[in-house]
Amino acid sequence: TEAILMGFDRIQAGKAKRMLVGSCSDHGVYLWGGFDAMRVLSYKNNENPEKGSRPMSASAAGFVPGSGAGALVLESLESALERKATIYAEVLGGEVNSGGQRNGGTMTAPNSKAVQRCITNAVENCRIKAKDIDVINGHLTATSKDFTEIKNWSEALQLKDAEFPYINSLKSMIGHCLAAAGSIECVA
């Protein structure tokens, strides 16, 4: 997803009118071994794969590894109209967070204050109100920290119960593709 924001910034700055933005991920035992050692990969349902990744569920037992790539054509409105392109979405803005392991964060559970600040800044950068958000594509990985993610969203948006937007997790269907996850999920 960071590639989308980088492309957005270049187009908005007039340095490009159209860009191909996306990412890819690797796969293999050396990549996934560390995650397995941290006990965040699903292993309890190897005989029943449809139960393998269940974010926000009482039976959540880790995520399923995935790999792949995703890319989007991002362009200015003028460029899209000029070439009569089908417009699927509009990028309003966003925010990038880094340093999630500082101040109490870990590799598997980022610093909640930094995450909440990132969400708040993204909403402000998009010039929308939290109540305007219809759906959130969550990071949700079917680990014990899914609850923390929902709590961070709820606190950052100041929305609770029926006001809280729908939240989904495509990782439950395609696996966690690490660096490619955001791009693949945006394409989906």
What are these regions (language model features)?
Residues 16-24, 86-94, 131-138, 163-171:
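Beta-strand segments within the central parallel beta-sheet cores of soluble alpha/beta enzyme folds
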Residues 1, 23-28, 93-98, 140-142, ...:
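Acidic, glycine-rich active-site loops and adjacent beta-strand->loop/helix elements
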Residues 1-5, 38-64, 152-184:
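Conserved catalytic cysteine-centered active-site region
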Residues 101-112, 140-158, 177-184:
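Short glycine/threonine-rich loop-to-helix capping motif typified by GTGT followed
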Residues 1-24, 64-85, 176-188:
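Active-site-proximal alpha-helical scaffold in enzymes
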Residues 18-32, 130-153:
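Conserved beta-ketoacyl condensing-enzyme motif
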Residues 7, 35, 73, 91, ...:
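Conserved small-residue
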Residues 46-128, 134-135:
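Condensing-enzyme catalytic core mediating Claisen C-C bond formation in acyl metabolism
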